[in-house]
Regions:
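Short acidic DE-rich linear segments
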Residues: 1-4, 105-112
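Negatively charged, low-complexity tracts enriched in Asp/Glu with abundant Ser/Thr
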Residues: 1-44
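Amphipathic protein-protein interaction modules
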Residues: 43-99
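Short, structured coil/loop segments at alpha-helix boundaries
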Residues: 26-30, 81, 92, 108
Length: 112
């Protein structure tokens, strides 16, 4: 069963940003960073970007764009996501830890 929970997302077609209020307890600086990251991605590349947690707590970048959108930069998309994963590694790992602790109820003290 692959249930995902959307953290946030941005849509270049409607020029909108979405933040899941279930995560409202995150620090404002993290929420701001996510907002900037998603909006800049869609401004640079186009399409729709969502950051989603999978059922194991891994944070994934999901990108969608209609096939008829010839302005969507598929190569730029891969490069931009790779850039974010490197530059924002610490923040992304912290978000995964937060999700696994508060949403999945994992006891992280017992990790080996």
């Amino acid at each position: 069963m692959m249930d995902t929970k959307v953290l946030c997302g941005a849509n270049s077609y409607e020029q909108k940003y979405y933040f899941n209020q279930e995560f409202s307890s995150l620090p404002q600086s993290i929420k701001d960073e996510l907002h900037i990251m998603c909006v800049l991605y869609t401004e640079d590349v186009g399409g729709i970007l969502t950051l989603e947690f999978d059922d194991s707590g891994a944070l994934e970048f999901k990108v969608t764009a209609p096939e008829e959108d010839y302005l969507f930069d598929e190569i730029g998309s891969v490069l931009k996501i790779k850039q974010y994963q490197e530059e924002k590694r610490e923040m992304l790992e912290s978000l995964e830890l937060y999700y696994r602790t508060f949403f999945l109820g994992e006891d992280l003290d017992g990790e080996e």
